[in-house]
A protein has these predicted regions:
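Cytochrome P450
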Residues: 1-368
Length: 368
């Protein structure tokens, strides 16, 4: 992946909006219209890897993760936890999230890494509280998530995976309340109780989705404030700009840059390219969100953008379940960040970007 990914996206939208990548063995899709079409048409572009001859767990449609399923299986499994992530449900957590954010920001020292000092802790503690994860286990849960996001499979992963399997099995053995973990514990799939593997896979997905995106969003918000001092002043003066600012950050610096696993369920011609049944497709959200055909002045960060139907959280049946929670965390975080730092100026020489083409954000972020 080129260092300047946004110039690369711009070139690919111009010369090859739908291109076959010989290195990855997949079709790369870069323009908004085609990415949106794929997200909205699961009957053509499936999330089920069995269309490519791969199996999530050896049998089609029975994998532990609903992100590798299509409806009705996807809906059946997703709906187990979906009520907890509705905007009306998430709003009830506001006061608790404010407390977590306030505690973290008060401990953040001048010159300290913003990512490890705040941006990691906020979403990890929020999702852990929602799931009922003991405080003593949260660091391990985060490490587990990092291994999976980074697609690292080594002795360290094997060790932590065995530990987490045993720990999760233990937690599920006595979960019978009204919290998310208890509801998953009692969950049914095709009227059959979930297996231990399915329960663990479900929780793993919620942990990953509940921390990585928000951590990167928080860091990218700080970057956007630093790069746009005029906008920083507007946001400081008027909280009415908060939501517009967050949505523009999601568009401009999308935390998830691409989704690598869609599979053609049938032969289909996409933007003049013949896609064959079983072909794998990667959809580049970060490119779609800067498409000149969809957004006015897409390379400009505009807090007053009128038409901002970005795809940072996806679209359609697989739209990010935790999007309302991420937005609420970002809004609460933005308030506390602005109050903590009278002037936000990122030290780009000292800060470090993540080395993972799938996600966009900082591994370390320092302010002067």
């Amino acid at each position: 992946m080129p260092q300047d990914i946004f110039s690369y996206y711009r070139r690919m939208r111009s010369v090859g909006p739908v291109s076959f990548n010989r290195d990855s063995g997949a079709w790369d899709v870069f323009d908004y219209a085609d990415v949106h079409f794929i997200l909205m048409h699961n009957e053509i572009f499936s999330s089920d890897p069995s269309y490519s001859g791969r199996m999530a767990d050896g049998r089609r449609g029975t994998g532990a993760s609903f992100i590798t399923m299509d409806n009705p299986d996807h809906k059946d499994l997703r709906n187990i936890s979906a009520p907890f992530f509705l905007p009306s449900s998430i709003e009830k957590y506001s006061e608790h999230i404010e407390k977590i954010s306030s505690d973290l920001i008060s401990k953040l020292e001048p010159g300290q890494d913003f990512i490890s000092g705040y941006a990691v802790g906020l979403p990890v503690n929020v999702i852990s509280d929602l799931l009922g994860v003991p405080e003593s286990e949260r660091e391990m849960f985060k490490a587990w998530s990092d291994y999976i996001i980074g697609n690292r499979r080594d002795d360290g992963f094997d060790k932590i995976n065995r530990y987490m399997y045993a720990k999760m099995s233990e937690i599920f053995s006595h979960k019978d309340g009204d919290d998310i973990m208890s509801v998953i514990n009692r969950g049914l799939f095709h009227s059959t109780p979930l297996t231990v593997e399915q329960k663990i896979g479900y929780v793993m997905l919620l942990i990953i989705g509940g921390n990585e995106t928000t951590t990167n969003l928080l860091g990218n918000m700080v970057r956007a404030l630093s790069e746009n001092p005029g906008i920083q002043e507007l946001v400081r003066e008027d909280k009415g700009y908060y939501r517009n600012f967050i949505e523009e950050t999601l568009r401009y610096y999308s935390p998830i840059q691409f989704l690598p696993h869609r599979f053609a369920a049938q032969d289909y011609v996409l933007n003049g390219k013949q896609i064959r049944k079983g072909d794998r497709i990667s959809i580049w959200l970060g490119s779609a969100n800067r498409d000149e055909g969809q957004f006015d002045n897409p390379e400009e960060f505009m807090i007053d953008r009128r038409k901002n139907n970005h795809l940072a959280f996806g679209m359609g049946v697989h739209m990010c379940l935790g999007a309302p929670l991420a937005r609420l965390e970002a809004e609460i975080g933005l308030k506390d960040i602005l109050e903590k730092f009278p002037r936000i100026n990122v030290n780009r020489e000292k800060s470090k970007m993540l080395d993972n083409p799938m996600v966009y954000g900082f591994s370390e972020l320092y302010m002067d």
